[in-house]
Amino acid sequence: MVNFCGKEFSSRLLIGSALYESPAIMQDAIRAAGAEIVTVSLRRETAGGKAGDVFWSLIRELGVTVLPNTAGCRTVREAVTTARLARELFGTSWIKLEVIGDNDTLQPDVVGLVEAATELVNDGFEVFPYCTEDLSVAMRLVDAGCKVVMPWAAPIGSARGITNRDALRLLRDRLPDITLVVDAGLGAPSHAAAALELGFDAVLLNTAIAKAADSVAMAGAFKLAVEAGRIAYESGLMDARDFASPSTPVIGTPFWHAVS
């Protein structure tokens, strides 16, 4: 089980609801992933009136916990306003907070992120901040009152996997009581497994599943990878070595093998 802001969930795979070929494929992929938390963009929900109502109905049919996000926001004021609108629309105080600082890399504006997180926490929100892997930023978010921190593995949609393993490991070591979720940059099930092997509590995916040739099958693959990664972490992974270490015992080795 994994705890998000006082609520227990069995799935460690959070999934996004954008970019799918069709609404039906989105539903089937979310089910195949076994996801219990689904991120939803306020802009997607409110765009198009009736179309937004249909989309929201499809999400409700899944019986999942909705995590609204502030995707596309580039200023503190825009993000805070979007979060408040999302709370009213979706009836939840949970918000995945994004404040984008660069259009090319979609890197978070970490200064604005901390400012927005502080304001939203003070306004009663449970903030899930999307950030870089920088420890000092994560610690400021925790100091602001965030119970969850969501560092990227790599830029959004890049599918590069974990590019700074040491930094992510440091986050886990220094923030043992904080729920940590790798968010963005994962492109393959093996990337998700690697994040869980580092001790991260969960991963959040969208593009890697939505843009797969078979989104439903890929969702199932990620589900298995996340489960395998967590089991591996809990089982205790052996330490990496610089040199070989024989796994075959020398006791009982024929005597002529010892003759030089």
Swiss-Prot record:
Key words of the record: Cytoplasm, Schiff base, Thiamine biosynthesis, Transferase
Family according to the record: Belongs to the ThiG family.
Example GO BP: thiamine diphosphate biosynthetic process
EC number(s) recorded for this UniProt protein: 2.8.1.10
Physiological role: Catalyzes the rearrangement of 1-deoxy-D-xylulose 5-phosphate (DXP) to produce the thiazole phosphate moiety of thiamine. Sulfur is provided by the thiocarboxylate moiety of the carrier protein ThiS. In vitro, sulfur can be provided by H(2)S.
Annotated catalytic residues: 96 (schiff-base intermediate with dxp)
Protein name per its UniProtKB record: Thiazole synthase
One matching Pfam family: ThiG
Lineage: Bacteria, Pseudomonadati, Pseudomonadota, Alphaproteobacteria, Hyphomicrobiales
Any GO MF annotation of the entry: thiazole synthase activity
Organism per entry: Rhodopseudomonas palustris (strain BisB18)
